[in-house]
Amino acid sequence: MIVHWIWLATRPNITDWLKVELLHSFQDPENVYFAEADSYKQVEGLTPEGLESLKDKDLRTAEKILADCHREHLQILTYQDAAYPSRLKNISDPPLVFYYKGRLPDFDGLPLIGVVGTRHASPYGMTTAKKLGYQIAKCGGIVVSGMAYGIDGMAMKGALTAGAPAVGILGCGAEMIYPPSNRPLFADVENYGCIMSEFPPGTPPVKWNFPKRNRIISGMSCGVLVVEAPEKSGALITARCAADQGRDVFVVPGNIDVPTFVGSNRLLRDGAIAVSSSWDILSEYEMQFPDKIRKDTAVSRQSVSEEELQKAAEAAKPLPKVAQKSRIFSKKQPPKEIEDKKVIDKAGSSLYSDVNDILPKLSEQEQQIVTALQGGERLVDDVIAQTGLPAGKVLATLTLLEVKGVVKRLPGKRICL
C-alpha cells in the first residue's frame, strides 16, 4: 500500500541509501513494515536509533501525508514504479518517494539536462540561461532545474518558450510556490511538465533542504550545465554531485573579472566541458538517443529573438552593489550584503581556518557535527549516531558545512574537518 511507502520514506535516523537497502532486503515496504524487529539487523549500517524508528508502526503521520496529497492534488511516484527515473536509481541515495504535480516525462527515453546557477545572475547569465534552455528543448532535450529565481527560472522559461516540458525539483513541498515571485512559472511548468519533491506536502523551504535536493537534479540528468556561479554557490554543489554520480558537467565560460562567474570558471579549470550552444551538450548523447536528439534543429546563438532576450535582460534582478565590484572580497571582512543572503551562496571556506573560530559562527546543529568530527575522520553514519540528529538533517548540514569550507568529504562515505 502507498501508505507503507510513505511510512518507510519518512523514517527518521535512517539514510536514504539504507532505506533502499531495506527495500531490497524485504522486497517491498509492506514487508519492511510488518517485519519482526530482529530481522532488521540483517541490514548492515542501521543505528540503534534507526532500529527504533522501524519499530514505530504508527501510520498516522503517513496517512496525514496521503490525505494532504489528495487535498493538494499531488500524485505519488515510488521507487518501484515503472516511471521512476532509472538513472536516479544508480546514485547512492535515491529518494523512495516523490510527490509531484503535472505530467511525468519519459525520464529514461529522453536526454534530461540539469541547468543550474546563481539566483543573483548578471543580465548576460540570465539571457544565456534562457537561450540555452530554449536550444536544449528545441533539440529534443528536457531541462531539469530547481525553480529558483535567476538562472534556474530563466532556463525553464526558455524551454517552455520552445514548446517543450520542463522538470522542476523543489526543496519544499511540491504544492508550495517558492519563491512566490515565480508563481506564473510554476503554473506553466505544472501545465506542460512536472514539479517534483521528495519532501512531503507542508514541508517549508528550509535552507538545509536545498543542498539535499541538488543530488536529484544531477542524478536524473545525463549531464549538468552550470551557467553562472560565484565561488560558493549552491550550483557548485550540484556540479559536485554530478561529478560524483558520473554525470557530465558543462559550463558557460564567463567574464573573469565578474565575481558571479568565479565558481563556474573554476569548474572549467577542473575539467568541465565548455559550452557555447546546446549542441555542445546534446552532441554528447546523440548516440544514446538517436531518435530523440534532433541535430537538424540545433539552433545558433541567435535563435531566440532579440526581443525575447531583451525581455529576459530586463527581468534580471540587479546584482547587489557589492557583488558588482570586479574583485574578490576580503577574507577577513565579508560584506554584509553577502552575509545576509542564503547560506549556500555565502563566501565561506576562506573565513574559517581554525575550529575554535568556527563554532561561534555556526548553528547549534552545525556545532554538534563539527564537535563530532574533531577526533578525526568519521563515517557519516557514526556522525548521525553520535549527534542523535535525523539522518536527513545531518546529510544536509554536512553539505552546508562543505560549502562553507568547514568539512571535507572523503572516499568511502567519510568526513573530516
Task: Give, region by region, the residue ranges found by the protein language model.
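Short, positively charged patches
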Residues: M1-K138
